[in-house]
């Protein structure tokens, strides 16, 4: 393992299995949560370097609620967040604008399902090596005695 820990929050077991296998084959440690509630609990239990969340879960666009909640949390707001969705394929709805603009979505990366393996891995690498991730790592090291 390369030491990087990823939390994957998605309610589709088949999709979760596929993404988990891709990430583990690339030597990432992956913890899975099948609901936002499980995801929040996992974030309280452990430390992660990246969160990947689906937009559509449960009763609707719960992934957006997860993203907003994480970005408002003092401890978790710098944790890189990658949102993946099949919403355009399912509904024809398309997110317009700059994904990094605060009024768009509070995420650091956005991919549409189905996601090509190389595109996913490149985006994960990019987010794990961003300046934001480096800041988070420094903060964690500074907290240790």
Regions found by a protein language model. Give the residues of each.
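The C-terminal output helix
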Residues: 122-140
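Short acidic/polar segment at the start of the alpha1 helix of CheY-like receiver
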Residues: 12-18, 117
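Active-site beta3 strand of CheY-like receiver
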Residues: 47-53, 57
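Alpha4 helix (beta4-alpha4-beta5 surface) of REC/receiver domains from two-component response regulators
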Residues: 61-65, 88-111, 118, 122
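Short hydrophobic/Thr-rich beta-strand motif most characteristic of the beta2 strand and flanking loop
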Residues: 27-35, 42
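His-Asp phosphorelay/catalytic-motif detector in bacterial-type signaling
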Residues: 47-49, 74-80
């Amino acid at each position: 393992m390369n030491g990087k820990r990823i939390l994957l929050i998605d309610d589709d077991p088949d999709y979760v299995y596929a993404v988990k296998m891709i990430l583990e084959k690339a030597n990432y440690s992956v913890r899975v949560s099948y609901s936002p509630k499980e995801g929040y609990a996992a974030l309280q239990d452990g430390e992660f370097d990246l969160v990947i969340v689906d937009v559509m879960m449960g009763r609707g666009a719960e992934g957006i609620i997860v993203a907003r909640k994480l970005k408002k949390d003092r401890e978790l707001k710098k944790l890189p967040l990658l949102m993946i969705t099949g919403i355009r394929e399912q509904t024809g709805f398309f997110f317009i604008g700059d994904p990094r603009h605060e009024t768009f979505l509070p995420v650091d990366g956005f991919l549409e399902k189905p996601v090509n393996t190389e595109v996913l891995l490149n985006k994960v690498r990019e987010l794990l090596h961003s300046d934001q991730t480096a800041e988070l790592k420094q903060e964690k090291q500074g907290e240790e005695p």
